[in-house]
């Protein structure tokens, strides 16, 4: 099966990002037909709003702090004909402007519409499912693409940079959404997560508001190890 990016609905998903209008204008200059969902509280509800807006079986989300590479529109993804794609989310890497990390955080995502309409994650997650309370990636079947076709600009203000660092400081310190004891932190946490966590806490002081991102990551890690609740990763949304 071939999935042509240009044939999918593309939705700009923004909440309160200080650079949202600037980034939306940039997206419209590249994708004039892009749709938009703005200001919906809760990650689960916001993604459902995207799905309800779309007319295609799959849709692509562009986060409010993102700008895309126009080459993305020319991409075609080859998928296994025998694979069940009804729960598969295709995730591209995004490059973080603060510290240069390139991974799934902030990257473009291609979602199956019906799955999104029926999923229960974040604020709508079952209380017995700690994984879904923190992120989408452990309940859905993620197909991670190594290519990066977007840049995350999450340092327009000190608050935005701090929040970006804080959320990653929390999430990268968890094991599939669950807290790791201090004794097991370095043995149970994936080495890639530890590397990215180190970068978030050490790199970026040379860019605007980068020190705030570093502080946020350190505070997020500290709270996770000492005071963690399942709401910690969402504290920055309020």
Language model features by range: what are they?
Residues 21-22, 70-73:
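Short glycine-/acidic-enriched loop or helix-start segments at secondary-structure transitions
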Residues 173, 177-206, 211:
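Phosphate/pyrophosphate-binding loops and the adjoining catalytic core of nucleotide-dependent enzymes
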Residues 228-233:
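Conserved small/polar residues in nucleotide/adenosyl-binding loops
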